[in-house]
A protein has these predicted regions:
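Membrane-interface helix-loop-helix modules in multi-pass membrane proteins
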Residues: 15-19
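Contiguous transmembrane helix-bundle modules in multi-pass membrane proteins
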Residues: 23, 29-189
Length: 189
């Protein structure tokens, strides 16, 4: 669960990579490196044999936090890029292309879930239910971005929506995956 950032931070991080500037490069390199270290077993095994302090002991679960961190920082750069594009009214094409690709991704996943049924029914029900909210968040934000092409003053509403949608999505994910003890067990009276 340490790698979860939400659908809009991922969108904004990709946007930051598309509009990449020199100051974003260290976070792109950190994100790619952390992802490779966390998901490439031969590389983890090799680093473990080197007996380097911290690096040899770092398990994939700890390294993935660096990926989440870099994705979050890139999302903040992407948000700046989005606001700049919407205020200056140029480079709409990159945002439209990225939104279109994300829309194709969402439609593809829904088609796979409904028609190909790649998993047992009990898992399929959970997968569909878990994909509803990210789809709604994405469509809502995309609608506001498209609306901002016509109404410039809606940018503040977009910022508020992205903040609330990401916060709610993170809270929902946390409550779902992190165990919490009942209050009476933690604070006995």
């Amino acid at each position: 669960w340490a790698s979860f950032v939400g659908i809009w931070p991922v969108f904004l991080a990709i946007l930051a990579i598309i509009f990449a500037r020199r100051k974003q490069l260290p976070f792109i390199v950190l994100g790619v490196s952390a992802l490779l270290l966390a998901t490439c077993p031969p590389l983890i095994t090799f680093l473990g044999t080197l007996k380097l302090p911290i690096i040899s002991n770092a398990v994939a679960g700890r390294i993935i936090i660096l990926f989440s961190f870099s994705l979050t920082v890139l999302a903040s750069f992407g948000f700046d890029d989005l606001v700049e594009v919407l205020e200056k009214r140029k480079n709409f094409k990159k945002i439209i292309i990225l939104s279109g690709l994300m829309l194709i991704f969402f439609v593809s996943v829904w088609l796979i879930l409904f028609f190909l049924k790649p998993m047992p029914t009990q898992w399929l029900i959970v997968a569909k239910r878990n994909f509803i909210l990210p789809t709604v968040f994405f469509l809502g934000g995309t609608f506001l971005i498209v609306l901002s092409f016509k109404f410039k003053k809606i940018i503040i509403l977009i910022a508020l929506y992205l903040l609330l949608a990401t916060s709610f999505d993170s809270l929902r994910f946390t409550r779902k995956w992190m165990p919490f003890d009942p209050r009476n067990l933690v604070y006995p009276e």
